[in-house]
Amino acid sequence: RELTVTVLGEKAYAIVEIKPSHEFYDYECKYTPGMSKYICPADLSPKSTNKIKRDTENIFKGLGCEVYGRADYLLADDGQYFFLEMNTLPGMTDTSLVPKAVAAEGLSFEKLVKKIIELSQ
């Protein structure tokens, strides 16, 4: 399973699970509306959710990241998860994952952009 976690400031937001219509989350699945299903928040136990979010916050800080970013993970069937990368300039389009994650916790796109500007000053 593919998971992604947005960090804004120092806070991790709702985990998004990506379910592409192809075997892999390729360009077409990423940028064509309807080619992937996004489950937000991801269907994980509260314990797993909290651990992944805390680990993401720690990775974000440990890498020296600022303002916002998005961490990608693979989740194995046994519950182990593997950090893949930290995206320090994630997309902000209609199909992007950062706006989906923050919206799941009540933050509108407009407020997201304002927060990014505020944190960047």
What feature does the model see in each segment?
Residues 1-54, 80-82:
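Phosphate-binding site of ATP-dependent enzymes
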